[in-house]
C-alpha cells in the first residue's frame, strides 16, 4: 500500500519477484473492483435518493479513497517496474507521490472517522459523554470531512516540498540517481524531514482509531457474553449478529494495522525494495486489502441488498 517502496536501484529480474508482482497486481485489481462496487452502489443511492446514513457516507468516502489509492499505487508499480533506474523524485514520481500522499492521508482519516462513528453509535457505555456524542456526532459529519481535507492537504504540501527540494538538489549538482553523494543527501532529508513528518501524520489517526476500536470491541464482547448467557447457543440470531459485527470489526482493524505497519516498515527501510521479503510482505498486505471489501459487501445491509437485486435481475426474477 505504500508508495515509498518505489525507490528502486536495479532491475527486478528475479522470477519469484516477478511472480509476486503479478500476484500484487491481481490483488490490487480485486481491491479496486471491490472498492469500486462499494463506491458505485452507495454513491448511486446517495445521488438518487439525496440522502444516506452518515455511516454509509463515510463508507462510500472510504471506498472511493481506497479505489483511487489502489489505482495510483498500481500505476506507480507498473511505472517503476518498467523504469527501475528512474530517479525516485523525478517529475513523474513526484506527481504520483503527490496523489499518493493525499489519498493515503484520506484513507487513514476516513477509516479513523468511521471507527469513531461506529464506536459512538454502537458502543453502549453509560458515561454521559457517550450519550452527548450520540446526539451530536451525525451533525459533525461535514466538519469531519472538512478536517480531513485540510489536514491531508497540509501534510501533502509538506511532503511535496521535501520531494521537490531533493529533486532540485539532484539537478543542481548533476548527480546520478545512485551516486553516493546523492544517496547521502537524500538519506539525510528522508531521515530528518520526511520520516518524522510521516510518523506524525500516520500516528495521529492511528491512535484515535485504536482507542475507538478497543472500546467498540470491548462493548460488543460484553454484549455477546450476555447474549450467550440468556440464549441457547451460537445459533441464536442475536448471537449471530454480534459475531458478524465482531468479525467485520476485526477484519477492519487487521487491515488498518497491516496498512499502518506497511507504511512504517517501508519508511524505516526494514524491507529493502528489491528484497524478496518485501514482495512477500506486500502480497500479505494486499491480500488483506482485497478481502476487506468482500467482508464489507456481506456485512453491510445496504450492500447486501444491492447484491441480491443484481442477482435477481440476472435471473430474471422481479
Curated annotation (Swiss-Prot):
It is a multi-pass membrane protein. GO terms for cellular component: membrane; plasma membrane. GO terms for molecular function: bitter taste receptor activity; G protein-coupled receptor activity. The chain crosses the membrane at residues 8-28, 41-61, 89-109, 129-149, 184-204, 235-255, 265-285. Pfam families: TAS2R. Residues 1-7, 62-88, 150-183, 256-264 are extracellular. Glycans are attached at residue 179. It is found in: Membrane. It comes from the Eukaryota. The keyword Transferase does not apply. Residues 29-40, 110-128, 205-234, 286-318 are cytoplasmic. Keywords: G-protein coupled receptor, Glycoprotein, Membrane, Receptor, Sensory transduction, Taste, Transducer, Transmembrane, Transmembrane helix. SUPFAM superfamilies: Family A G protein-coupled receptor-like (SSF81321). Its main location: membrane. Belongs to the G-protein coupled receptor T2R family. Most taste cells may be activated by a limited number of bitter compounds; individual taste cells can discriminate among bitter stimuli. Receptor that may play a role in the perception of bitterness and is gustducin-linked. May play a role in sensing the chemical composition of the gastrointestinal content. The activity of this receptor may stimulate alpha gustducin, mediate PLC-beta-2 activation and lead to the gating of TRPM5. This is Taste receptor type 2 member 60.
